[in-house]
Each structure stands twice: as structure tokens, then as C-alpha cells.
Amino acid sequence: MENSMTLPKIKQVRAWFTGGATAEKGAGGGDYHDQGANHWIDDHIATPMSKYRDYEQSRQSFGINVLGTLIVEVEAENGQTGFAVSTAGEMGCFIVEKHLNRFIEGKCVSDIKLIHDQMLNATLYYSGSGGLVMNTISCVDLALWDLFGKVVGLPVYKLLGGAVRDEIQFYATGARPDLAKEMGFIGGKMPTHWGPHDGDAGIRKDAAMVADMREKCGEDFWLMLDCWMSQDVNYATKLAHACAPYNLKWIEECLPPQQYEGYRELKRNAPAGMMVTSGEHHGTLQSFRTLSETGIDIMQPDVGWCGGLTTLVEIAAIAKSRGQLVVPHGSSVYSHHAVITFTNTPFSEFLMTSPDCSTMRPQFDPILLNEPVPVNGRIHKSVLDKPGFGVELNRDCNLKRPYSH
């Protein structure tokens, strides 16, 4: 362990990508939508593009997997390295190597907040309210936390102040909540398959899916719907009421990110006891403050897209101040180390990436080595007791470094 007064400086930052439109298809990794054929995650799931028949059957048909995985590695002067992955691919590599590098190299490995603030402010003129640029900044931020943990010999969750519970319990996102129940998860979240362009028939079909799973899973197992920005307020409200008899726990991301008034109206008109949730495609701290003010029940930032761990901690504080939960969108170890320190995250999400949801596959497979998966729906804090985020980069993947500096 390094003496706290002599922490090393960062020598270099490097960026690779794998998968996406300019590399091999089905690479998986940080871009978990980049899967092969016959995978549940690409099977007639409702999206904002579903209203166009040419793009209704497959999300890959409209390009959901064009970005690919971004891998950022930071190296300290003592030779230690930290890394992280997200969804930004080749374009993220350009941003890291040609712009953000100047804010990283030469800084102390503990200067995470300074680097974060400089990256955010230096990209304001082209980052908008999130998206590719924020994904890239998030990836750098996570890599910095990984490096800091490895330098001082501590897991990231201890750098954040330590665990507030002994284990994390998970619900599973996938097409088969009935299988998730058998694996020990506390609930199952299904994608919707129909949208406003399908009219009331679409509502009946998705409600029938919920009814079928309720019968298979029993009364107490949580069931939720992920609507992936595909609806309008009227349709979402009608769908929520159609699913109420089957004890739907929450309805998620019905509307596009900026429709704050719509979320306020949906929460106001949703069935009593049914939660309204959103947040995975919100990309700034300010957007989460506004989202929080709509009164939704759970905010769901993705730590690889919202600004990184540094921003996620701030979002959790906003939610806590309003009595709201923060349950991050997937993100594996990058979420695990955060949520085990949050008092307002009583459970977390595990995204099923096996094609038929029948086996436990790590979310970012194959890019991470030693990536933990829940056992009987849980991960004990002792599993996280490794320096940094506790995973290593699989350098046998087809990594490409298109830029340097």
C-alpha cells in the first residue's frame, strides 16, 4: 500500500473499443445490447422506433448496438493500472485520447473529483444532456476509482465509506421471471412488446403477459414492466391500470427522458400502490434533480452513462433527501460497490444476458474477468473485498486502440 502522502500521479490514459458498427457483431461486453442471434434482449421489444414497421421486430435493426464497448485504462507512475468499461465504442476512444487526456495525465490518483469537474465543464459545449459524451466521462471516472482503490489496496465501496448492509439482494431483468424466481431473485422485470401504435390491443397483450407470469410466479414475487421510452402518458396510464389486478410492482421508463411533466402526470394517475420509475437514460445531475421533483418513486441512473460513480453518489443524495429510492440500472460491479453503501437502495438490478434467461451469465461477459454473479439472488459484501472494483480486463477480447496521443 502506498503512503497516503506519496500517492502516485497518473502517467497515461488509454482507450480501446470492441464490437459496434466498425468491429465484430455480437461482442457483448460493456455494450450489452450487442448480442448474437436469438437473444431475448433483441426479440420484438417495444421502443420509440417500434411505430415504424421496418424497425419493430429487432432493436438491432435500428442500430441499438452500433456503439460497442469502450474500455478506458489509466496507468499510474508506479505501474499500477485501473480500468472500466461502458457503451461508447470508437467515438468514445477519440474523446478520451484527443480531449479528456489533458485533464487526467499528471494528476494525483486521488484527484477524482477535480478531474470529473474539469471533464464535465470542458465538454459542456458538445455534451448536451448526456449520451455518448457522458458515457465516455463515466467510463473515465470509473477507471479512476478502480485505479485509486488498487493503489491504496481497498475495494471501492470502502473508499465510499463502507457497506451499510451485509449483502445485496437482486431482482432479475429478462423475459422469464418464472426462471428468475427459481434462481432465488426477489422479482422479475419484463420488457413490454407493444406500444401506442398498437392501441388497446397492445395493452391487452402486455397485460396478458403479466397475468401469465403472475400465475406462474405466485402472489408475492415481484413483477415489473420495462417500457424503454416507448409510450405516451395516456397509453402508460391505461397499461398501468390494466396490470393493477396482477399486483404489478412498478412500471418503468414509459416516457422519453425529458418529458418531466408527463412523469408527474403518470405518477399522479397511476394505480394506488404501483410505483413509477425512470432514469437510466438521464445523463446529468441536473436532470435527476428535475426527475426527482416529478415525484416518481425510484430513480434508476446507469453509473456508466450518468457521469460515473462520482455523479451516482450525488444522485443518491438527491433521492435520499426526498425519501426516494435509487436503484441503478444494471452495471454489475460498478453499481455493486456503490449501492452497498447507499441507505436508500434496498435492492438492485441484475440484467440477464444469457440468451434464454436460463443460466447465470455475467452482465459484461466476456470483457471482465472474475465478474461476480448473484448466488440465490444475492451477493455478499465479502465478494467485493478486492482492490478497486475487483475485476480484471480480458485482454483476449479483440481490443482496438484507434487513437493515441
Swiss-Prot record:
It is an enzyme of class 4 (lyase). It holds the Pfam family MR_MLE_N. Binds 1 Mg(2+) ion per subunit. Mg(2+) binds at D226, E252, E280. InterPro entries: Enolase-like_C_sf, Enolase-like_N, Enolase_C-like, L-Rhamnon_dehydrat, Mandel_Rmase/mucon_lact_enz_CS, Mandelate_racemase_C, Mandelate_racemase_N_dom, RHMD-like. It catalyses: L-rhamnonate = 2-dehydro-3-deoxy-L-rhamnonate + H2O. Reaction proceeds via a syn dehydration. Belongs to the mandelate racemase/muconate lactonizing enzyme family. RhamD subfamily. Catalyzes the dehydration of L-rhamnonate to 2-keto-3-deoxy-L-rhamnonate (KDR). This is L-rhamnonate dehydratase.
